[in-house]
Amino acid sequence: METKQLGTTEQDLALAGELLRQGQLVAFPTETVYGLGADALNETAVAQIYAAKGRPSDNPLIVHVAEKADIAPLVREIPEKAKKLFDRFFPGPLTVILPKSDKIGKVVSGGLDTVAVRMPENPVAHRLLQLAGVPVAAPSANTSGLPSPTRAKYVQEDMNGKIAAIVDGGDCAYGVESTVITLATPTPTLLRPGAVTKEMLEAEIGPIAVAPAVLEKMADGETAASPGMKYKHYAPKAQVILVNGDSAAYAAFVNSQPGCYALCYEEDRVTVPKVPYGKATDDLSQARELFDALRRLDELGAKKVYARMPRKTGVGMAVYNRLIRAAAFRILDLTRPFLIGVTGPTGAGKGYVCRLLAQAGLHPVDCDRVYGQLTVPGAPLLQDLSLIHISE
């Protein structure tokens, strides 16, 4: 298949809209990431999204609309809290989940009885939706599991030859996918963090819950209520390990790891190859640059990456949510002491190894020396252990 490379002229957007109406796939920019769109009311077209991305069929899609009035036919009802969110955040980087109407098929909803709706604020996306004249189901326009594309060139790398057209609208403003909140539960629940933060949502509709899978691995057998919850996402080809620690501890650790790359803040001083993802005090810049940084790590041929852990509040929660999945939930916590026992015959280099481990911020223990102390009657270490375990 030849993939048309389109710009943002009225003629190009009209062609893209016509392709969508014909049941074909079109990638287009939004303020969050590039989306891979199909007519949401055409299940044959929607099924092509899953095939092009290699996406599991139980991973629901978000339906994009041009106007607020386009939402009503897609849902069974619009509760008062939804109206408040629409008034405050639509158009914008927020997705709201509501009970679906019969117009939305199970292919779009991932087999659920709900639908996720969003009205993007990106002017190119908005005009395309107007010209298409249909609601558009669109996940991120990347191969499933890889970092979401924030530039058209990354869409081309993943989707060229698989879809009808790519609309190049430049870089995405926010850089991470939309916030997702469900109102189909007794308590409104945040399912995916984004640029619209938990605090901003609560200012409009009161307290909301945060789904455990936002910050942790989803339980086996649990049904994904939102895109991005269940499967490994956002990951480069390299192995990523998330590192929790302050700037000094992080730098000391990564500088002792030969052959690794550092995915960190601009201010972090490291001697290993470094790919920054924003400033330490600016979580909006972290969100905007994260996926581009993950893609660059692949371009550089990185094999192992130690990523600096962001904070978990505000937009930082969105950055953490993406990074923890890119790392397949691997975390190295430098705030907890790591005790590493070292043993071996005299002359084996235990002292040298202990010094290297200490430089990495770890806590080596010469096990042979400890054992030697424990065999001496009345040794201070033996007395200390006796006091600790006196009841035994």
Which stretches of residues belong to each language-model region?
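Active-site-adjacent structural elements in enzyme catalytic cores
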Residues: 1-335
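P-loop (Walker A) phosphate-binding loop of NTP-binding proteins
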Residues: 345
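ATP-binding Walker
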Residues: 348
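Short beta-strand-centered segment that lines the nucleotide-binding/catalytic pocket of NTP-utilizing
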Residues: 364-375
